[in-house]
Amino acid sequence: DIGILQDGFPRESNVVIEVGGVRTNFRMPDILAIGLGGGSLVSADGKTIGPQSVGHNLVSEGLVFGGKTLTATDIVVATGLVEIGESSHVAGLRPETREAATLEISRMLNAGIEKMKPSSDPLPVILVGGGAVLITEDLAAASSMLRPEHAGVANAIGAAIAQIGGESERLVSYEKIPRQEAVQEVTQEAMALALAAGADSASLRVADVE
Protein backbone atom coordinates (compact mmCIF):
# COMPACT_ATOMS: atom_id res chain seq x y z
CA ASP A 1 0.00 0.00 0.00
CA ILE A 2 1.20 3.51 -0.84
CA GLY A 3 0.11 6.74 0.84
CA ILE A 4 1.27 10.34 1.10
CA LEU A 5 2.18 12.28 4.25
CA GLN A 6 1.38 16.00 4.25
CA ASP A 7 2.56 18.03 7.25
CA GLY A 8 3.03 14.81 9.17
CA PHE A 9 -0.49 13.51 8.52
CA PRO A 10 -1.84 11.08 5.90
CA ARG A 11 -3.32 12.80 2.86
CA GLU A 12 -7.08 12.38 2.94
CA SER A 13 -9.02 10.78 0.12
CA ASN A 14 -11.36 13.08 -1.80
CA VAL A 15 -13.52 10.23 -3.05
CA VAL A 16 -16.07 8.04 -1.29
CA ILE A 17 -14.44 5.12 0.50
CA GLU A 18 -16.15 1.75 0.75
CA VAL A 19 -15.46 -0.56 3.69
CA GLY A 20 -16.68 -4.10 3.14
CA GLY A 21 -18.82 -2.86 0.26
CA VAL A 22 -20.50 -0.18 2.39
CA ARG A 23 -20.13 3.46 1.35
CA THR A 24 -18.82 5.55 4.25
CA ASN A 25 -18.84 9.23 5.08
CA PHE A 26 -15.66 9.13 7.15
CA ARG A 27 -12.40 10.94 6.59
CA MET A 28 -10.11 8.24 5.24
CA PRO A 29 -6.48 8.27 4.13
CA ASP A 30 -5.76 8.29 0.41
CA ILE A 31 -4.21 4.86 -0.09
CA LEU A 32 -3.25 3.03 -3.27
CA ALA A 33 -3.20 -0.76 -2.94
CA ILE A 34 -1.04 -2.25 -5.67
CA GLY A 35 -1.44 -5.93 -4.81
CA LEU A 36 2.22 -6.45 -3.99
CA GLY A 37 3.37 -8.05 -0.76
CA GLY A 38 5.63 -10.72 0.62
CA GLY A 39 3.11 -13.44 -0.17
CA SER A 40 2.28 -12.28 -3.71
CA LEU A 41 2.33 -15.12 -6.22
CA VAL A 42 5.01 -15.00 -8.93
CA SER A 43 4.53 -16.62 -12.34
CA ALA A 44 7.02 -19.20 -13.59
CA ASP A 45 8.67 -16.66 -15.90
CA GLY A 46 8.73 -13.95 -13.21
CA LYS A 47 6.89 -11.44 -15.39
CA THR A 48 3.63 -11.44 -13.42
CA ILE A 49 3.35 -10.78 -9.69
CA GLY A 50 0.07 -10.82 -7.74
CA PRO A 51 -2.55 -9.77 -7.09
CA GLN A 52 -3.15 -13.31 -5.83
CA SER A 53 -1.28 -14.02 -2.60
CA VAL A 54 -0.74 -16.80 -0.09
CA GLY A 55 -1.23 -14.16 2.60
CA HIS A 56 -0.53 -15.32 6.14
CA ASN A 57 0.22 -18.80 4.79
CA LEU A 58 3.54 -17.50 3.46
CA VAL A 59 5.42 -19.18 6.32
CA SER A 60 4.16 -22.57 5.17
CA GLU A 61 3.67 -22.19 1.41
CA GLY A 62 6.64 -20.02 0.35
CA LEU A 63 9.64 -21.86 -1.10
CA VAL A 64 12.08 -20.50 1.47
CA PHE A 65 9.85 -21.92 4.21
CA GLY A 66 9.70 -25.38 2.68
CA GLY A 67 6.52 -24.86 0.65
CA LYS A 68 5.89 -25.25 -3.07
CA THR A 69 4.65 -21.80 -4.09
CA LEU A 70 6.90 -19.16 -5.67
CA THR A 71 6.31 -15.84 -3.93
CA ALA A 72 7.78 -12.35 -3.99
CA THR A 73 9.64 -13.17 -0.76
CA ASP A 74 11.37 -16.07 -2.50
CA ILE A 75 12.50 -13.70 -5.24
CA VAL A 76 14.18 -11.20 -2.90
CA VAL A 77 15.82 -14.03 -0.95
CA ALA A 78 17.12 -15.45 -4.24
CA THR A 79 18.85 -12.13 -4.96
CA GLY A 80 21.02 -12.70 -1.90
CA LEU A 81 20.15 -9.28 -0.47
CA VAL A 82 17.64 -10.54 2.09
CA GLU A 83 17.94 -13.36 4.61
CA ILE A 84 14.58 -14.99 5.33
CA GLY A 85 13.91 -18.69 5.74
CA GLU A 86 16.22 -21.13 3.95
CA SER A 87 17.93 -19.54 0.95
CA SER A 88 19.03 -23.00 -0.22
CA HIS A 89 15.42 -23.69 -1.20
CA VAL A 90 15.60 -21.06 -3.96
CA ALA A 91 19.16 -21.78 -5.09
CA GLY A 92 17.80 -23.57 -8.16
CA LEU A 93 15.58 -20.69 -9.24
CA ARG A 94 16.30 -19.71 -12.84
CA PRO A 95 18.26 -16.42 -13.07
CA GLU A 96 15.89 -15.21 -15.81
CA THR A 97 12.91 -15.68 -13.49
CA ARG A 98 14.63 -13.91 -10.61
CA GLU A 99 15.70 -10.97 -12.78
CA ALA A 100 12.30 -10.60 -14.47
CA ALA A 101 10.49 -10.66 -11.13
CA THR A 102 12.90 -8.16 -9.58
CA LEU A 103 12.26 -5.78 -12.48
CA GLU A 104 8.50 -6.25 -12.15
CA ILE A 105 8.61 -5.47 -8.42
CA SER A 106 10.47 -2.23 -9.15
CA ARG A 107 8.09 -1.36 -11.98
CA MET A 108 5.02 -1.86 -9.80
CA LEU A 109 6.46 0.23 -6.98
CA ASN A 110 7.64 3.07 -9.21
CA ALA A 111 4.30 3.16 -11.05
CA GLY A 112 2.41 3.26 -7.75
CA ILE A 113 4.55 6.05 -6.33
CA GLU A 114 4.24 8.10 -9.53
CA LYS A 115 0.46 7.74 -9.39
CA MET A 116 0.29 9.01 -5.81
CA LYS A 117 2.78 11.90 -6.04
CA PRO A 118 1.31 15.41 -6.26
CA SER A 119 3.95 16.39 -8.84
CA SER A 120 6.59 14.83 -11.06
CA ASP A 121 9.36 15.64 -8.58
CA PRO A 122 10.85 12.64 -6.73
CA LEU A 123 9.84 12.37 -3.08
CA PRO A 124 11.40 10.64 -0.06
CA VAL A 125 9.88 7.22 0.50
CA ILE A 126 9.50 5.72 3.97
CA LEU A 127 9.53 1.92 3.91
CA VAL A 128 7.45 0.25 6.63
CA GLY A 129 5.48 -2.93 7.12
CA GLY A 130 6.22 -6.50 6.16
CA GLY A 131 6.24 -5.72 2.43
CA ALA A 132 9.14 -3.28 2.83
CA VAL A 133 11.52 -6.23 2.65
CA LEU A 134 10.74 -6.49 -1.08
CA ILE A 135 12.51 -3.20 -1.80
CA THR A 136 16.17 -4.08 -2.12
CA GLU A 137 17.36 -1.31 -4.44
CA ASP A 138 16.79 2.39 -5.09
CA LEU A 139 13.57 3.41 -6.82
CA ALA A 140 13.57 5.91 -9.68
CA ALA A 141 10.47 7.64 -8.30
CA ALA A 142 12.09 8.23 -4.90
CA SER A 143 14.54 10.99 -4.02
CA SER A 144 15.64 8.90 -1.03
CA MET A 145 14.47 5.83 0.84
CA LEU A 146 14.15 5.73 4.61
CA ARG A 147 13.89 2.44 6.49
CA PRO A 148 13.05 3.26 10.13
CA GLU A 149 14.08 1.00 12.99
CA HIS A 150 11.48 -1.72 13.65
CA ALA A 151 9.81 -0.86 10.32
CA GLY A 152 8.41 -4.38 10.07
CA VAL A 153 6.00 -3.75 12.95
CA ALA A 154 5.02 -0.20 11.96
CA ASN A 155 1.29 -1.01 12.19
CA ALA A 156 1.57 -2.01 15.84
CA ILE A 157 3.74 1.01 16.66
CA GLY A 158 1.30 3.33 14.90
CA ALA A 159 -1.63 1.91 16.86
CA ALA A 160 0.26 2.38 20.12
CA ILE A 161 1.20 6.03 19.51
CA ALA A 162 -1.90 7.15 17.62
CA GLN A 163 -2.70 10.79 18.29
CA ILE A 164 -5.99 11.99 19.75
CA GLY A 165 -7.91 14.45 17.63
CA GLY A 166 -11.13 16.36 17.33
CA GLU A 167 -13.14 17.40 14.31
CA SER A 168 -15.88 19.95 13.84
CA GLU A 169 -17.93 20.99 10.81
CA ARG A 170 -20.53 23.70 10.45
CA LEU A 171 -22.45 25.46 7.72
CA VAL A 172 -22.27 29.23 8.15
CA SER A 173 -23.47 32.30 6.31
CA TYR A 174 -20.72 34.82 5.69
CA GLU A 175 -23.46 37.45 5.62
CA LYS A 176 -23.98 36.85 9.34
CA ILE A 177 -20.43 36.08 10.46
CA PRO A 178 -17.05 36.82 8.81
CA ARG A 179 -15.18 33.79 7.51
CA GLN A 180 -12.19 34.25 9.82
CA GLU A 181 -14.42 34.45 12.87
CA ALA A 182 -16.33 31.36 11.76
CA VAL A 183 -13.08 29.44 11.29
CA GLN A 184 -11.92 30.45 14.77
CA GLU A 185 -15.18 29.29 16.35
CA VAL A 186 -15.14 25.93 14.59
CA THR A 187 -11.45 25.51 15.44
CA GLN A 188 -12.21 26.07 19.13
CA GLU A 189 -14.99 23.49 18.93
CA ALA A 190 -12.61 20.93 17.40
CA MET A 191 -9.98 21.63 20.06
CA ALA A 192 -12.58 21.23 22.81
CA LEU A 193 -13.57 17.86 21.37
CA ALA A 194 -9.92 16.76 21.25
CA LEU A 195 -9.40 17.80 24.88
CA ALA A 196 -12.55 15.98 25.93
CA ALA A 197 -11.17 12.85 24.26
CA GLY A 198 -7.98 13.09 26.32
CA ALA A 199 -5.62 15.19 24.20
CA ASP A 200 -2.78 17.14 25.82
CA SER A 201 -3.54 20.87 25.67
CA ALA A 202 0.18 21.66 25.37
CA SER A 203 0.47 19.78 22.08
CA LEU A 204 -2.77 20.81 20.38
CA ARG A 205 -2.45 22.12 16.84
CA VAL A 206 -4.70 22.56 13.84
CA ALA A 207 -4.08 19.81 11.30
CA ASP A 208 -6.37 20.97 8.52
CA VAL A 209 -8.93 23.66 7.70
CA GLU A 210 -11.29 23.39 4.73
Language-model segments: residues:
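Helical "lid/coupling" subdomains associated with nucleotide-phosphate turnover
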Residues: 3-210
